[in-house]
C-alpha cells in the first residue's frame, strides 16, 4: 500500500514504530514483552492480594485496586498491538486506530483524576487520622472513583469525535508506535486549529485541575508532618505518601512533556520516548512502587501465602 492517497479519507493507517532495523525491532519486542508480562503479574497480583486480605479493605487500597486496573487496561490498549507491529504487519484500521485512541485518552484522563482522589485520601489519613473513617465514608470513596471514569469517558468522547470529523486524504503513515493525538493531527489535510485548541484545553484542564488538587493535598500533608514532634512519627507519615508522590512525579512529568505543547513542536524520535514510559513502563513500575515500600502489602502477601499453605 502506498503512503499517499487521493481518497477523501483513508481506510487504514501505517504505524512506523520505533525503528526500521529488524535487529532493534526484535530487541524491542523481547524487552516490551518482558515488561508487559511483569505488568500483568504485578497488577493482577496487587488486585488479588487486596481482594484476598481483609486488612487491606480500606479506602487507600480501594483506590489502589482501581489504579492497578487502569494500569493493566492502559498497558493492554497499547502494548499487544505494539508487539504485533514489531513482528508482523504495522497496519491498523481507521476504526481500530480511533478505538485505541479513545481507550488511551479515557484511561489516561481517569488515571489523572484517580491520582487526585488518592492524594485526597492521603490528606485525610495524615491530617485527620482520628476522623479518617468519618471523612472517607464508602459513599465518598465511590464518588471519588466514579468521577475519574465519568470525566475520562466524556473527555475522550469529545476528543475522538472532534478528530473523527477531520479528513485524512494525504498520507496514512503515523510516525508513532500507537494512535496518539499529535501524530494523527499531523496527517489531517484539513484545518486542525480548532481541534488542536479543544484538545489542548481538555488536556491542559485535566493536568492542571488534578495537579492543583494533588499539590494542595500535599501542602497540607507537609504542614502536618512538620508539626509532628517525633522523628519516627514523621518518617511513618512520610512513608505513607512517598510511593504515591513518586508515581505522580513520573506520570505527570512525561504527560506534561508530551501534551502541553502545540502540535507543530512535535518531534519524531524525541516525542516517542516519553510515551514509552507512560504507556509501557509506568504501568509496570506502579505495582513495584506501591508494594516494595509498603509493609502492609508485604505482610498481606505473607498472610495470604500462609493461609494457602494451611489450607493444604
Swiss-Prot record:
Subcellular location(s) per record: Cell membrane
Glycosylation, residue list: 6
Record protein name field: Olfactory receptor 8H3
MF annotations from Gene Ontology: G protein-coupled receptor activity; odorant binding; olfactory receptor activity
Residues in the Cytoplasmic compartment per record: 48-55, 121-139, 218-237, 293-312
Coiled coil: none
GO CC annotations on file: plasma membrane
Keyword terms of this UniProt record: Cell membrane, Disulfide bond, G-protein coupled receptor, Glycoprotein, Membrane, Olfaction, Receptor, Sensory transduction, Transducer, Transmembrane, Transmembrane helix
InterPro entries per the UniProt record, alphabetical: GPCR_Rhodpsn, GPCR_Rhodpsn_7TM, Olfact_rcpt
Segments traversing the membrane: 27-47, 56-76, 100-120, 140-160, 198-217, 238-258, 272-292
GO term, biological process aspect, one: sensory perception of smell
Similarity-based family: Belongs to the G-protein coupled receptor 1 family.
Native organism: Homo sapiens
PROSITE patterns noted in UniProt: G_PROTEIN_RECEP_F1_1, G_PROTEIN_RECEP_F1_2
Membrane topology: Multi-pass membrane protein
Record function comment: Odorant receptor.
Disulfide cysteine pairs (residue numbers): 97-189
Residue ranges, Extracellular side: 1-26, 77-99, 161-197, 259-271
Keyword Membrane included in the entry's annotation: yes
Classification via Pfam families: 7tm_4
Amino acid at each position: 500500500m502506498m503512503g499517499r492517497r487521493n481518497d477523501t479519507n483513508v481506510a487504514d493507517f501505517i504505524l512506523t514504530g520505533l525503528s526500521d532495523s529488524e535487529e532493534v525491532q526484535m530487541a524491542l519486542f523481547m524487552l516490551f514483552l518482558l515488561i508487559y508480562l511483569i505488568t500483568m503479574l504485578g497488577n493482577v497480583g496487587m488486585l488479588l492480594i487486596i481482594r484476598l486480605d481483609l486488612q487491606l479493605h480500606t479506602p487507600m487500597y480501594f483506590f489502589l485496586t482501581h489504579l492497578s486496573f487502569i494500569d493493566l487496561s492502559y498497558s493492554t490498549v497499547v502494548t499487544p498491538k505494539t508487539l504485533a507491529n514489531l513482528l508482523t504487519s504495522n497496519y491498523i484500521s481507521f476504526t481500530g486506530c480511533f478505538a485505541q485512541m479513545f481507550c488511551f485518552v479515557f484511561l489516561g484522563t481517569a488515571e489523572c483524576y484517580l491520582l487526585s482522589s488518592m492524594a485526597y485520601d492521603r490528606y485525610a489519613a495524615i491530617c485527620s487520622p482520628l476522623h479518617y473513617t468519618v471523612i472517607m465514608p464508602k459513599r465518598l470513596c465511590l464518588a471519588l472513583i466514579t468521577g475519574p471514569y465519568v470525566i475520562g469517558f466524556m473527555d475522550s468522547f469529545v476528543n475522538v469525535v472532534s478528530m473523527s470529523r477531520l479528513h485524512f486524504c494525504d498520507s496514512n503513515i503515523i510516525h508513532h508506535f500507537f494512535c496518539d493525538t499529535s501524530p494523527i493531527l499531523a496527517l489531517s489535510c484539513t484545518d486542525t486549529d480548532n481541534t488542536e485548541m479543544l484538545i489542548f484545553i481538555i488536556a491542559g484542564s485535566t493536568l492542571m485541575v488534578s495537579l492543583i488538587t494533588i499539590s494542595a493535598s500535599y501542602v497540607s500533608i507537609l504542614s502536618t508532618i512538620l508539626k509532628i514532634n517525633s522523628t519516627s512519627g514523621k518518617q511513618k507519615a512520610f512513608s505513607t505518601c512517598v510511593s504515591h508522590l513518586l508515581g505522580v512525579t513520573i506520570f505527570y512529568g512525561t504527560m506534561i512533556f508530551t501534551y502541553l505543547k502545540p502540535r507543530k513542536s512535535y518531534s519524531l524520535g524525541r516525542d516517542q520516548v516519553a510515551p514509552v514510559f507512560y504507556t509501557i513502563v509506568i504501568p509496570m513500575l506502579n505495582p513495584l512502587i506501591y508494594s516494595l515500600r509498603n509493609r502492609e502489602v508485604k505482610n498481606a502477601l505473607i498472610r495470604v501465602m500462609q493461609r494457602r499453605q494451611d489450607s493444604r
